[in-house]
């Protein structure tokens, strides 16, 4: 990579752009959903916070995948191969499978932002549980995936 923008700056700009675009789309979707389902707009700051932190975690995951593969087609394929099964794992309720299998599913789901984002949005939209825990979890995942993306760029720059 050459140019006036640092690698970290480029990753931060891409993450910010992806986060802003994602939040705008999600706010429009929730507004459309409110035509059919009652939404408590008094909780708007809470679900906006959940959307922003969740979108940032997903943006960082996308940046890490892109930095690890360095090819657009491979990154897209890897993103779909990873994300579709992981999204289903986030939706598995506790009584649907054996307890040992559910513990494995919880451990795998904790490494990716799907389940924490679902928990954060559920807490923000429906007042269902604690919002702080999922937001901290998503923030940690955003930092971890951002660092992974940055380290991946450094590794490829050396070769």
Task: For the regions a language model picked out, list residue spans one by one.
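Hydrophobic alpha-helical interface/terminus motif in multipass membrane transporters
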Residues: 32, 36, 65, 69, ...
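Transmembrane helix segments
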Residues: 69-111
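Hydrophobic alpha-helical transmembrane segments
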Residues: 1, 19-30, 76-94, 155
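Junction motif at the cytosolic side of a transmembrane helix
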Residues: 64, 125-126, 137-159
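Hydrophobic/aromatic residues in alpha-helical transmembrane segments
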Residues: 28, 60-61, 85, 117, ...
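Alpha-helical transmembrane segments and their short interhelical loops
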Residues: 7-79, 131-135
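Short hydrophobic, aromatic-rich alpha-helical segments embedded in or entering the lipid bilayer
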Residues: 96-135
């Amino acid at each position: 990579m050459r140019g006036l923008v640092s690698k970290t700056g480029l990753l931060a700009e891409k993450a910010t752009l992806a986060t802003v675009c994602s939040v705008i789309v999600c706010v429009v979707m929730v507004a459309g959903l409110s035509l059919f389902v009652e939404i408590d707009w008094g909780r708007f700051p809470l679900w906006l916070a959940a959307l922003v932190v969740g979108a940032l975690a997903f943006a960082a995951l996308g940046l890490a995948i892109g930095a690890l593969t360095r090819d657009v087609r491979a990154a897209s394929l890897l993103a779909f191969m990873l994300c579709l099964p992981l999204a289903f794992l986030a939706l598995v309720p506790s009584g649907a499978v054996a307890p040992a299998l559910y513990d494995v599913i919880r451990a795998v789901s904790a490494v990716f932002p799907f389940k924490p984002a679902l928990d954060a949005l559920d807490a923000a939209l429906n007042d269902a549980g604690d919002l702080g825990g999922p937001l901290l979890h998503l923030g940690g995942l955003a930092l971890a995936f951002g660092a992974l993306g940055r380290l991946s760029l450094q590794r490829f720059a050396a070769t």
